[in-house]
Amino acid sequence: MDLMEKNLELVEIQKLEGHTDRVWSVAWNPVSSHADGVSPILASCSGDNTVRIWEQSSLSRSWTCKTVLEETHTRTVRSCAWSPSGQLLATASFDGTTGIWKNYGSEFECISTLEGHENEVKSVSWNASGSCLATCSRDKSVWIWEVLEGNEYDCAAVLTGHTQDVKMVQWHPTMDVLFSCSYDNTIKVWWSEDDDGEYQCVQTLGESNNGHSSTVWSISFNAAGDKMVTCSDDLTLKIWGTDIAKMQSGEEYAPWIHLCTLSGYHDRTIYSAHWSRDDIIASGAGDNAIRLFVDSKHDSVDGPSYNLLLKKNKAHENDVNSVQWSPGEGNRLLASASDDGMVKIWQLATKP
């Protein structure tokens, strides 16, 4: 289906109010958003030191705040991420800790607190199997934590290499390859060649190899895992590709190569980019706007190119910090978080 030929619009479904400070990040529960008859669940985290859990009613289709996770973090909660099972929620905070919350149905309990970073924790990410998670911090380090029995978490590795604040960590969707991006303008790829847990930096994507020229804020992968989008303070989005079959065979590391750069679509820092399961890239930026892009399907001599699908100006009243597509197939729901204190739910729909 050629999305460019369809007359699409991004429709605001609901504005979720409750946070009393800027909202930094949103995360969809991976299980609830898939299952038939199960209400979608969204987590949001904020400068008000809390995480809110939102649920959509199966009857009214409206969203309500089901619970507020508070009194664990003493400073801003910068990032939140669900485990693949949807049972655990990890929360990264400026207080230097990462909280692990267990979903007991109607309530959540903080079952573990990961300590070790010297400064603010900026991001947290689970690997595809849920056997470990990664965190990163203003202390320039990336930590890998192994999930043990009895709600115990063990620091398996401390990865150093970035020269500045690390903004985000993201595991590859199908393999235990970890990606980090930083205020040092680079993306680093970490891989354990022998699967022995000894992670090494196997590639650095920087300005010298068609990378970004300023802070890299966000990383996201397409469903197949053979392409990656990154976004930056340099006002661009970049698309990268790899030989995924070679990587999955385990024979050797297949380097990521720059495929194309999308520029001129935002005029302030691009803070977030997220790739949907049906291949639509969303971006959110400091210009209060959201943009959607799709593969043009017309590969030129220079490689693939991406077209602007639509633009939503004034999506929020302030910076858009996070955009996240629902993992559910075909529903085309997008959540956004902003400095204006709001979370918004959008639907990509055909114009009437």
Swiss-Prot record:
Repeat recorded as keyword: yes
GO biological process: iron-sulfur cluster assembly
Keyword Cytoplasm among record annotations: yes
Coiled coil: none
Pfam families: WD40 (PF00400)
UniProtKB keywords: Cytoplasm, Nucleus, Repeat, WD repeat
SS bond list: none
Known function: Essential component of the cytosolic iron-sulfur (Fe-S) protein assembly (CIA) machinery. Required for the maturation of extramitochondrial Fe/S proteins.
Similarity comment: Belongs to the WD repeat CIA1 family.
Protein name: Protein CIA1
Species this protein is from: Arabidopsis thaliana (Mouse-ear cress)
Highest classification ranks of the organism: Eukaryota, Viridiplantae, Streptophyta, Embryophyta, Tracheophyta
UniProt gene name: CIA1
